[in-house]
């Protein structure tokens, strides 16, 4: 297996221009495809997940022009639901941000479309979304295991009253919200259980509004969406930098700055993961906010005990930053780590122990106590981009670290290690 050894880093200092947000990129692409008019998306993320969405849209007959560097995309809107005249199978890799929204959007009208993906995608639950779509009239079959992809979609979603479980993934609600305006009837979505990752719903509602559709949000418990609407292209849309990707660089600044500045996000960002910077500040780092940047300067870091439900992806970065904090750090309410690219709670606990940390892994929490000195280790990445990026922070010590399968960062940040090297001074 390919590996990359990072030598100890004495200091980090500099500016990182962030790649586009994965969450925003794939939502914007789908809405642009469903809308009336042509949309020009800039700062689009070039990554595996976005390529899977683009490939699916192309197979569905959507016309778009992509720049050579794949960060500018001109999408000719379809002016309504996406249809396939023939049977179609779409392979979506391990892209949850493509699988969930497409599973809903392709239930409009009548289709015969199979959505499938990598083996890990077939382990990521989709049952709650399918149940909700069926309540709205959709005809959906599981082709292998019940409640998991691959699924066959035969259309039929007309709206009405639907109930969706919000406790596993906010992407199920996102998928329903983006599809509902194009259904013939009004849709009332009621949430069962606690809604996880609320800020991701805010991204969805913001994008829908950008494309001309308002949703009545009743305290995140009920959402009322008028049917028989159409999305309207905003013309041009700038995709924000990826706030989850920012977390590694901001944490590096907190641990071994200098000052690290990330651009492309700022105090008014639509992404909830910018709140990660508040956690670093609470730990003792110095954080500065601008309209289009966040910067972080080294401070003496102390452990925190916090509920991380609102920033599940960026919270992983705190688990490795905890190796540099005084005391025991506890991250709570993170059950949904278990249904991401890999079981991230298990993976994180396993790999933190390799570098010498004392770790307690609960059903929905993790507790990390750093060792006196980090140990040299080979870090397994579980084909999970965030594991690879999180554990790069171990090199901000006097211990080198080896990352196995470093190219898995291609899911959201293909040149991550080059960017980290650019702001690093080796010990």
Curated annotation (Swiss-Prot):
Chief place where the protein resides: cytoplasm
Entry binding sites for phosphoenolpyruvate: 22, 96, 124, 171, 344, 386, 411
Compartments where found: Cytoplasm
Keywords: Amino-acid biosynthesis, Aromatic amino acid biosynthesis, Cytoplasm, Transferase
UniProt keyword Lyase present: no
Gene3D superfamilies to which the protein is assigned, alphabetical: Enolpyruvate transferase domain
Catalytic activity: 3-phosphoshikimate + phosphoenolpyruvate = 5-O-(1-carboxyvinyl)-3-phosphoshikimate + phosphate
Record: active site: 313 (proton acceptor)
Pfam families with a match to the protein in the record: EPSP_synthase (PF00275)
Residues that hold 3-phosphoshikimate according to the record: 22-23, 27, 169-171, 197, 313, 336, 340
GO molecular function ontology, one term from the record: 3-phosphoshikimate 1-carboxyvinyltransferase activity
PROSITE patterns registered for this protein in UniProt: EPSP_SYNTHASE_1 (PS00104), EPSP_SYNTHASE_2 (PS00885)
EC number(s) stated in the UniProt entry for this protein: 2.5.1.19
Region forming the signal peptide: none
Record's protein name: 3-phosphoshikimate 1-carboxyvinyltransferase
The species this protein was found in: Enterobacter sp. (strain 638)
Lineage, opening ranks: Bacteria, Pseudomonadati, Pseudomonadota, Gammaproteobacteria, Enterobacterales
